[in-house]
Amino acid sequence: MTQVTIYTTRWCPFCVRAKALLAHKGVAFDEIPVDGDRALRAEMAARAGRTSVPQIWIGEQHIGGCDELFSLERRGGLDALLSDRP
């Protein structure tokens, strides 16, 4: 399964939703909490071009946030990305 990385904050409801969808699908992910860590938040913003959380990557592909993750799931594209081998 492709590596999934998600930048989060502890109190973000969109982060909770995104993580719940991934967990429901049995996907292990690397969570990078950016609460109060300016360096990690700056890293996320530089990588994503966005400052909002969550920011999600599947492999090297930036998915975006929670809305984009759920949209990908509704279109039937999430499982294919998750099962891709690099």
Language model features by range: what are they?
Residues 19, 47, 79:
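Chalcogenol-based redox active-site neighborhoods
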